């Protein structure tokens, strides 16, 4: 089914998988993002927030490396809040709550404009390993990528 080789296959299209696929493709690797549902690429969990002490630090680091999570969060924000204001400035941490549907839509728009990136809707069910190297993945629909 697949007549091209991929340098990187990202399994899972949540916001972390979307970020990984974008980073890989932007570095020039021919990348495939495999997701169970193309309509939910980039979808947030039930708590539609980015930020906080731990996750906020990661978002800032991703942003500094050219990632999109912070940008997509800003574009789809419905509330901004600085957490831990009752503590010292070292503990302050920004958090944004986003519109879940808009967040997924914006991520999809970003990914569709990314060169070197293809999408495939299916479920990865294992790994194809040859000589201790991962060479591909089998899918639930019986394809080998």
Question: What residue spans do the PLM features occupy?
Answer:
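Conserved N-terminal/central alpha/beta ligand/cofactor-binding core
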Residues: 5, 22-133, 139-143
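Beta1/beta-strand and adjacent pyrophosphate-binding region of the FAD-binding site
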Residues: 2-16
């Amino acid at each position: 089914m697949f007549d091209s080789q991929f340098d990187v296959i990202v399994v899972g299209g949540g916001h972390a998988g979307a970020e990984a696929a974008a980073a890989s493709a932007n570095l020039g690797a021919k990348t495939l993002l495999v997701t169970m549902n193309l309509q939910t690429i980039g979808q947030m969990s039930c708590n539609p927030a980015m930020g906080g002490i731990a996750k906020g630090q990661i978002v800032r680091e991703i942003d500094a490396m050219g990632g999109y999570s912070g940008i997509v969060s800003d574009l789809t924000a419905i509330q901004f809040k600085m957490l831990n204001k009752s503590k010292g400035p070292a503990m302050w941490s920004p958090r944004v709550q986003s519109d879940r549907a808009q967040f997924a839509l914006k991520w999809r728009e970003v990914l569709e404009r990314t060169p070197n990136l293809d999408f495939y809707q299916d479920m990865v069910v294992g790994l194809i390993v040859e000589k201790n190297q991962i060479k591909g993945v089998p899918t639930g629909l019986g394809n080998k990528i």
